[in-house]
Amino acid sequence: AIKSDYPKIKFKVGDRYYWSPSLQTVFYAPLNNGSIDNVLLIHELSHAILNHSSYKKDVDLLKIERQAWDKTLELASAYNVHVNTTEANDALDSYRDWLHNRSVCPTCSAIGLEVDNKEYSCVACGTKWRPNEARICQLKRYKIK
């Protein structure tokens, strides 16, 4: 029913759940028993419905994730899918942790500010750095000279 309700959005099997705005496709990864995690599918569909495509500042990612989880709760109700709000909050917490970790100065460990598109500056020691994407890999921070 979900797929037929959104004919302009493609759904394809992938190695994880994510929305690809360039392909207009929701990718999903069936579980070992072949079933689909409907909550994650609806969450990624929510990104599609909300036209989420990119973000300029890291804090914007947290904002669009919050929007997507709010939409997930709305859609899940319409499709009679139970969303464990603790798990949804845990997912948002993981983005908050991601944001915090990116803002830690690689020189003095103080919290820096994102001053430009994915460029941080430490208010304590003046170091500037760019973190890698690190949403699904290990975080690295590269000092800017």
Task: Label each residue range with its predicted role.
Residues 35-40, 86:
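Alpha-helical scaffolds flanking conserved acidic
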Residues 3-13, 50, 58, 75-82, ...:
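N-terminal accessory/interface modules of nucleic-acid-binding and processing proteins
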Residues 45-62:
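Catalytic Zn2+-binding segment of zinc metalloproteases
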Residues 60-88:
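Post-HExxH zinc-binding segment in Zn-dependent metallohydrolases
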Residues 29-32, 59, 113:
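Short N-terminal micro-motifs specific to bacterial/archaeal maturation
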Residues 1-37, 48, 52:
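Active-site scaffold of zinc-dependent metalloenzymes
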Residues 79-89, 93-145:
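Pan-zinc metallopeptidase signature
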